[in-house]
Amino acid sequence: MLTHKTCQARKKMQVSFVIRDAEEKQHRNGVNALQLDANNGKLYSAGRDAIIRVWNTRTDSSEKYIQSMEHHNDWVNDIVLCCNGRNLISASCDTTVKVWNAQKGFCMSTLRTHRDYVQALAYAKDREQVASAGLDKAIFLWDVNTLTALTASNNTVTTSSLTGSKDSIYSLAMNPSGTVIVSGSTENILRIWDPRTCMRSMKLRGHTENVRCLVVSPDGNQVVSGSSDGTIKVWNLGQQRCVQTIHVHKEGVWSLLMSENFQYIISGSRDRNIIVTEMRNPSNKTLVCEEQAPVLSLGYNIDKTGVWATTWNSDIRCWKLPMYDRCTMNSSGGMDAQWTQGGTEVACIKGGAAIKECAVLNDKRYIITKDSQDQVVVYDVLRVVKKEQLGAVDYEAEVKKRNKQVYIPNWFTVDLKTGMPTIVLGQEEVDCFSAWVSIEAGLPECVDPTTEIKINYGKLLLEALLEYWTPPHSIPPNEMEPDMHGNGYFQVPKHTPVIFSEVGGRTVCRLLVRDAAGDSESTLLHETAPQWVTDVVIEKNIPKFLKIPFFLQPHPQMTKPERTKKDRLVANEFIQCRKVCEHVLEKVLNAETTPSGGNANNSLQNSQSDANSEGSQLPAEERIELWCNDVVVDPNMDLRTVRHFIWKQSTDLTFQYKTKQNFNYDGSIGDSLERVTRKY
């Protein structure tokens, strides 16, 4: 028997997974950050779809994709290349900082020091030092050489922290020599530290809204900041003041890029414009381009004649930069300066569509989505696959057409934050074990439709997601016993990412379905999987049935209206109404007992006997009619569907019954509660 590690202090957990292709070569949402390895011509992009992708910028082919780097499960907000391009550091909304082998694309280690979204990174190239900051108001300093040396056995790392921030940090910058680090936050101020001593040296006021982007000059004497207030400010740290305010954008400035000589500012804004401005003469500016969406990040191309730009959309474009020509002679013989033509799109890395809308169908197995390109798709949540590509059809009409009049409790939620459907299973507001259905309704393709087996969607799905998990120290299965791995009905795609996380909090474990058999993954699952998961996956416990109380009484049109007794029963909520008809027929009306004819003659008795014999061969639903709220109930409906669509009241469900034929009846309803509960 497996002994699962438990801890009373452990936070409540949830399990989520993503329905996606085995290889997602395109970004499926906006791109938050870029890093260029100029030596190898590789462009790294950090996506809101939780994936870092690598692109070959030296090819003219439209196929620039090299590989994906996957281990985050929420937006990747920032990335930095270090160690001459050998390693990459990433920061994410999943509250982690990850260290990657940039060449091979695998995650080397995960840092879980932050307690909230990690928004920004800063890198001091000369010192191989990285700083991270986020919404938890904390700034941590990391030695890159130490991070890249971490192993499974040597996994302890120390960090220095910079304290004093009073609000969420959205931007961070450091000069190459690591003598100055600057943070920007929703305090609307800049805070400056000396990372060598971890001492705060000053704070600078001037912005009126969140400081979204920062650049520090190589010598550490100047800082350029961009803010949601729409301004760009130049700060002199020696004078501890703002020396210039630049107004070139109509909305917030979200990205900054400086020329090597620190004379020109390239800025990207929420207003979708990318503008080049001479820092000493802000009136000398020119529009590079107008993007299709707010600009999130900017980065030079290899020869710095162009700039890569990312936006809320998933495309990544490279725009030719205009050059500032000071050698143009004017009509009076003097020299004028002017910008050469720029703004031409020289390359584009196409992105994919992000899912923007989602509807869960009443059967609680399928969802219908609509993406940013108006494509409508049907997904099978239970089997974790795309079921049908409908194209650019009427989304609402498809939802209406495919919704059946059936009620099944919610057992999962859908998160579209990454642009791909993420299904969340838990035990909080939505109980993943609440959906019991008959197997002919839930898995008609798997069994004989005449069977009366009941299945639990949540249990089957968890068993499929963790099919390959063999916990350490578990007893090997007996050779004479059947293998109990999986759910016995279906498998899910092996490439499916499965994430264990705290409810409303940090990620604890992420793995692919196929990797659960690995020793390290198995041990990690054993340490992190919540008890409600191991109960069904390892212990093979059956989730409890949910029951519905209801009243049963004769219809006013019954031949014996004096029978007005109203009895309360309890049954499993997934019981079909035909079972209630059978109960009425067998236990209330005693239809199986041949009624005596009294003083009637033999011919009449024989006639009645023949009729009763013929009628007894009919199914109960053809002999008994159930009513609810003056509506005839479909015998194929289950109790919860009747309560949801017909009864529509908070009080106990009430049925009325009457016969469809003139059957004689006699009997009582006194023992119905116990018998209905046991049989159904």
UniProtKB/Swiss-Prot annotation:
Domain of life: Eukaryota
Residue ranges, annotated region (Disordered): 592-616
Residues in WD repeats: 26-65, 71-110, 113-152, 164-203, 206-245, 248-287, 290-329, 350-389
Disulfide bond entries: none
Family annotation (SMART domains): WD40
GO BP terms in the entry: double-strand break repair via homologous recombination
MF terms in GO: ubiquitin binding
Function, as annotated: Regulatory component of the Usp12-46 deubiquitylase complex. activates deubiquitination by increasing the catalytic turnover without increasing the affinity of deubiquitinating enzymes for the substrate. The complex deubiquitylates the wg/wingless-signaling receptor arr/arrow, which stabilizes the receptor and increases its concentration at the cell surface; this enhances the sensitivity of cells to wg/wingless-signal stimulation.
Assigned protein family: Belongs to the WD repeat WDR48 family.
Oligomeric and partner information: Catalytic component of the Usp12-46 deubiquitylase complex consisting of Usp12-46, Wdr20 and Uaf1; regulatory subunit that, together wtih Wdr20, stabilizes Usp12-46. The Usp12-46 deubiquitylase complex associates with arr/arrow; the interaction leads to deubiquitination and stabilization of arr/arrow.
Protein name: WD repeat-containing protein 48 homolog
Source organism of this protein record: Drosophila erecta (Fruit fly)
